[in-house]
Amino acid sequence: MAKEIKFSEETRRALEAGVNKLADTVKVTLGPKGRNVILDKKFGSPLITNDGVTIAKEIELEDRFENMGAQLVKEVATKTNDVAGDGTTTATVLAQAIIREGLKNVTAGANPILLRKGIQKAVTVAVEELKNQSRIVETQEAISQVASISAGDEEVGKLIAEAMEIVGKDGVITVEESQTMNTELDAVEGMQFDRGFVSAYMVTDVDKMEAVLNDPYILITDKKISNIQELLPVLEQIVQQGKKLLIIAEDVEGEALSTLVVNKLRGTFDVVAVKAPGFGDRRKEMLQDIAILTGAQVISEELGYDLKEADLSMLGRASSVKVTKESTTIVDGSGDKKAIEDRVTQIKHQVEQTTSDFDREKLMERLAKLAGGVAVVKVGAATEVELKERKLRIEDALNATRAAVEEGIVAGGGTAFVSVIPAIGTLIESLEGEVKLGAQIVKKALEEPLRQIAINAGLEGAVIVQNVVNSEAETGFDALNEKYVNMIEAGIVDPTKVSRSALQNAASIASTFLTTEAAVADLPEKEDAGMPGTGMDGMY
C-alpha cells in the first residue's frame, strides 16, 4: 500500500493537533469542579464519565497523522492507569504541556535530543523531591481522604476506608453493580490467586471476559489432567447433581480440555479449569490453603489419592467463584472454621521462624488470602448511565487508595507538582545550553495541573498558580471552596505513586515525541468510481 510521508515542522504540527484534540477533551474533567464527557456506545446507552483513560481510549481521529499524535498521548494515560490505576487526566495534562513548550523550543532551533536529556534530568529531580515530601498513610482517616478526593465523594471515601480496615492492606476489594439504588459494602471471606481460566471458551460473561460460578463444587489436584477418562467418574456425579465445577490442577490440556470445552458450549455442564497457583513446594502449600478454605481434599498421589476414585465428598464448596483471564477469586468457602484458624496460626508461626525476606513476603501473601477475605463494594444508582459513571469513579478511588498505602501521599490539587519547582530551579542553575532549556520545559509544565484545576473551576489559572508558588510548603488552592489552605491538613491529598507515575509517563512520551522528524502513514484508499450514468435518470 502507498504511504504518505510528512517531514519536520509539518509532521510536528499535525501530531500536535492530534495531541491537543485528545488532551483538550480529557482535561475538562480535572479537579473537583471538572465536568464529565459523554461517550457514544454502539450498543446500549451512552457512557458519561470523568475517567481520563476511559475517554482517551474512545478517541480515534480521521486524519491519520493527527491520530498518531492522539495515540501517543493515549499511551500516557493507559500506562499511568496500568501502573497506578488513577491520575490519567493529570498525566495527559502534563504530557500536553511538555509537548507544547518543547515544540516552541524545537521550532526556534533547539536540538530535541538535548532537550530530551534536560527533560529527563528535571523529571528525575522532581520524582526524588516528591518521594521526599511523601507521608506514610497509617490511619483510616487518611485512607478515607485519598478515596474521597479521587471519587469526589466523601461517602465513597468512608466506604473504601472501611473495606480496607476489614480486609487489611493486602486483602482483596472488588467493585460490583448493585440491584438497589444504594452503594454499600459487603465483606465476605474469600481468596484470590493469580491464575485465570485455561480456555476463553469457559467464560460466562463475554463482555467482561469472566466466568462466574455460583455454588460450585471445587476439585483440587496437583497433577496434570490430559485424559478425560480420569475425570469422568466425578463429572458424572456433578451432572447428576446439576451443579457447576471449578477444577484447579497443575494443567488441563489435550483431550480433557477439548472435551470440557465442547460440553460447556453444548450446555451439558458448567465447568471452569484453572492452573494451580505458585510453583514447587509453594504450590503444594497454596493448594492445601485452598482445600482448607473450601473444605476439599487435595487429590494427590503423594497422599494416596487417585483422581479416578474421587467422589463428591473430596470436593470443596464455595458460594461463588469468579475467574478472569488473570485471576480466580473464591468467595465464602465452606471449609471448617477451626481448620482455617489452625492454618492461619501455622502460617503466622512460619513467618516468625523464617529468615528469608522473600519467603516471609510469600507467607504474608498466603496469610492475607486466607485470613483477609474479600470486600465487595456494591455500587447502586437510579439509572444505568449514572451507575456506570459512579462505578468508574469508585474503581479509580480504590486504585488511588492502594497506591497511597503503597508509597504514601503528597499535597493534592496540583500543589505537589508546584512544590517541587524550587528543586528543579536549583538543577537548572547547574545546567547549560539546550539541556537547561529541557529542564525549564518541565518547570513550566509542572504548573499546568493546578492551572487547569483553576480554569475548570471558572477562575484565572495564572493568578492561582502564582499565589501558590509564592506560598508556604503544602499550601495550595482548594478549588471546591475557592480558598488557599494547607492541603494535607484539609485532607486534599494525592497518592505519591499516582503523581510520580503521571509525571514519569508524561515526560517519557512527550520527550520522545519532540525527537520526531518524519511521520509515515497509509494513504486513504480511493473509492471505486460508480457505474457511468446513462443520461436517463429515473428510467430502467
UniProtKB/Swiss-Prot annotation:
UniProt subcellular location: Cytoplasm
Stored InterPro entries: Chaperonin_Cpn60_CS (IPR018370), Cpn60/GroEL (IPR001844), Cpn60/GroEL/TCP-1 (IPR002423), GroEL-like_apical_dom_sf (IPR027409), GROEL-like_equatorial_sf (IPR027413), TCP-1-like_intermed_sf (IPR027410)
Cellular component annotations (GO), alphabetically ordered: cell surface; cytoplasm; extracellular space; peptidoglycan-based cell wall; plasma membrane
Transmembrane residue ranges: none
Enzyme class: isomerase
Pfam families in the record: Cpn60_TCP1
Keyword Cytoplasm: yes
EC number: 5.6.1.7
Keywords tagged on the record: ATP-binding, Chaperone, Cytoplasm, Isomerase, Nucleotide-binding
Binding site for ATP: T29, L30, G31, P32, D86, G87, T88, T89, T90, G413, D478, A479, L480, D494
Annotated CDD domains: GroEL (cd03344)
A biological process term (GO) from this entry: response to heat
Variant or mutagenesis effect after changing A339S: In strain: ATCC 43603
SUPFAM superfamilies on file: GroEL apical domain-like, GroEL equatorial domain-like, GroEL-intermediate domain like
Function: Together with its co-chaperonin GroES, plays an essential role in assisting protein folding. The GroEL-GroES system forms a nano-cage that allows encapsulation of the non-native substrate proteins and provides a physical environment optimized to promote and accelerate protein folding.
Subunit structure: Forms a cylinder of 14 subunits composed of two heptameric rings stacked back-to-back. Interacts with the co-chaperonin GroES.
UniProt record similarity statement: Belongs to the chaperonin (HSP60) family.
Name of the protein in question: Chaperonin GroEL
Taxonomic lineage of the native organism: Bacteria, Bacillati, Bacillota, Clostridia, Peptostreptococcales
